[in-house]
Amino acid sequence: MSGSLNSRWVVQVSLTIINIIGFLVFLRGFFPSKVVLPGFNSFQDSTKSPFSDQYGNPQFNKFILMVVDAMRSDFCFSDRSNFSFLHQLINQGRALPFTAFSNPPTVTLPRLKGITTGGTPNFLDAILNVADDQDDSQGLHNQDSWVHQFRHSNNKTINFFGDDTWLKLFQDQFTEFEGTNSFFVSDFTEVDNNVTRHLDDQLSSNKWDGLILHYLGLDHIGHKGGPESPYMKPKQIEMDKILQRLYTYVTKNDDTLIVLMGDHGMNEIGNHGGSSPGETSAALSFISPKFNHKGESPLPYNSDYSYHHKISQIDLVPTLAALLNFPIPKNSLGVIAKEILEIWPENQRIKILLENCAQIMNLYEAKYGPSGKVWSQWENLQAKQHPIADYYEFLQDIQSEMASSATNYGYKDIYAGALILVITALAVIVVFNRYFLTASNMNISSVMFYELFVVLYSLHFHGSSLIEEEHQIWYFFTTATLLFLAITFFDTFKSLQNFISFGVLFACIRFMRSWNNSGQKYSSQYNIAYYLSHSNPNLMWGLIILTYFVLTLCIYIQGSLVPTFAFSFGKRLPDVKDPGGLISFIVVFVATSVSFSFKLLQYYIDGNTIPKWLNRFLLWIIESHHIDLSSATLEDNELKFQLQSVSIQLSKFTTIILLLLVISRVIIGKIRKIRYGTITDITNIMTIYLIHQTRHENIPIFLALMFAKFALSKLIYRKTNRIDQYILTVTMTVLCLQNLTFFCMGNTNSLATVDLSNAYNGVKAYNVFLVGLLTFVSNFAGPIFWSLSGLQLLYEPSLLNFNGPATTDLLHYTGLKKSILLVKSLISLFFYTVSAVNLVGSCINLRFHLFIWTVFSPKLLFFGSWILFVNVLIDLILAVIVLLF
């Protein structure tokens, strides 16, 4: 390890920072702010509206928009739906039902922009969707929308209650309003009650012309328990009863239109953000006693979620404009719903469609100019009257063409960012090869294998299906890497112990591979996690208890926690009567017990049935906090709030006690000069917290991870005499296991699989930084586990074998600590820089690809999380902090 260590660190850290800067510059160009036409629209004929009747009156003077977040089409229209009053209205012809296609990304902010402006979403909005409450960068105050048009066309008032995203978008547009935060997903009840409590006052007054209600509870239930949650049925019934209240008001005020809709749907696990049929199929109904279009409801359930007529969700915008008589917003790509057109007399329908055509052609002209085949078609439509079907065909063709080409890339930033990434990658390749091929005493075959592995992996970014099914690639590369190391480094076939250890490692990997559905193309219930959570919760909780038990033993036996706190000196495992050893055991036992209690209570609050043999323990947890269950049910809101409060306390206590345990271990270890075991103790204590932040059905996978780590430590034990070879082997293996575990825990490269169910553990109110951190930990628990385990395998492999500290452990080479971490970081940096170049290159090459927003763009965001949070924050910064102690 030649050369100045400090100068090498400066070079490597600089390359890491430059790589991140290049990636961020590229993202700024790839996700630019959307360019829209300025100003606000007016009717083509300024003297008369084409939407008003012969007396100049609109079809409706007032409206009530009821948005139920994540209301998938089947929740309203299928035979599994609990919207019985809505079904009655459809059968009577008073409701016109639609399945509305929601353009990805299917998260609230871009969808609200789409359904108010009629424009296609900007993928950047998926990131801004989690922006802080004080961030007003998403606002639409300078962009045309039906909210602006309705309010200003006839000096009308709109009141709003619900998701505060509306207040960020439309500042100063609402006369009366109250916002509720959309990200506190643990709350199913109060978040909706805060909307409904305004209804009596609003429906008894005439102080509004428009009333917008945005309910979040159904979405929160989906995030916590999925579409099959036991809370889903009562929530649908609650929403149906609210609709009934609104319709009762409308029967007495028949100039008021009700619009019931979902902003997007949800997938089979209750999340959204991607492009699956469940996520993009939202319910939409126009409701009024004026309608007389009899339908049939409910319809048989179908897995495509296609019910009644299918339209694009942005078609709501011109449809509302026509019904409420105001100009269609300037940037709308929506098409007036054909079924709604029947409310006007036949001689007026073509005028209405021509208004829609003229508005959308203004957009077309601004982009392409007044020429070409499309322009000729438009002139032909204006010249003479055509069948209504011709106008709709023309509008839908233009909508499709304009929506697919709505992106305005910032090419200067794209190419600048790509150039920075290429230069950085070339520099890292030179540094990597210069060190491993010249300055290091390495087996060249291992270096060449790693470089080939990185290049082959990074090439997969050029295929959309390979990105969607990346878990298959990592299963292959992990298997191939271990087989290569079995021959070149592990000495697998030279002893029975090594052969058994290798077999255990492979068995654990195969076990992990079967744990969850991974990937985006194929979904199946034939996996371990689904079996445990749906068919055998008794076994699941037995495995959860076993996981906590094994981890508690590892903390107590594996590292040096006990000797650190022991009153007697010099013994690795002091006498059982030693007060210090007893205290350390009690603290660890309390931490794991409280964490387990939290997970059990969380499972119960989410509406799941607790195994009978755990009922007494659950009852003890609840009654110890002075809550009486004898006369209450989980549907009781007051009880639910009390249980939620207990859950928050348990989670906070777990976090605090684990943090104090780590701090005490480090400080007392420093005072007593106990050098060995610090990394192992921190890793094991942190693993409790990772389990604490993991979904219930995924907790037992940590048993497989711990056994895999133990087997791997057996294979590399006492092989540290070839230090560089050892570092490359451990880093390469950990890199494979990090990524494989990420996918095996149910994650994919889709925003729809981002798990929010543990993002609010111990959190009483929404805090963007705290929730963001918890979201990262809960979704990247597997990679974080292997990051910390990698340090164990590098510096303290003997402790992993329960053998006590050995002189061969690299921890004892204090002068090499920084050098070892430097080499490890160089190996990781080589992987991330080469991968970044290929990913960025594929996005540039395929920027007009059909799946650019549904596959490649989410991958960019996930890759950004890997390089910034996993590689830099965990693998580098956290590693430096751990090694300092």
UniProtKB/Swiss-Prot annotation:
Membrane association type: Multi-pass membrane protein
Residues passing through the membrane, by range: 413-433, 447-467, 473-493, 495-514, 539-559, 581-601, 648-668, 697-717, 726-746, 768-788, 820-840, 865-885
Enzyme class, spelled out: transferase
Record EC number: 2.-.-.-
Glycosylation sites: 82, 155, 194, 443, 516
GO CC terms: endoplasmic reticulum membrane; plasma membrane
Name of this chain's protein: GPI ethanolamine phosphate transferase 2
Biological pathway: Glycolipid biosynthesis; glycosylphosphatidylinositol-anchor biosynthesis
Phylogenetic placement of the source organism: Eukaryota, Fungi, Dikarya, Ascomycota, Saccharomycotina
Domain of life: Eukaryota
Functional description taken from the UniProt entry: Ethanolamine phosphate transferase involved in glycosylphosphatidylinositol-anchor biosynthesis. Transfers ethanolamine phosphate to the GPI second mannose.
Keywords for this protein: Endoplasmic reticulum, Glycoprotein, GPI-anchor biosynthesis, Membrane, Transferase, Transmembrane, Transmembrane helix
Gene this protein is translated from: GPI7
Cellular compartments annotated: Endoplasmic reticulum membrane
Family designation: Belongs to the PIGG/PIGN/PIGO family. PIGG subfamily.
GO biological process, one term: GPI anchor biosynthetic process
Disulfide bonds: none
Keyword check for Cell membrane: no
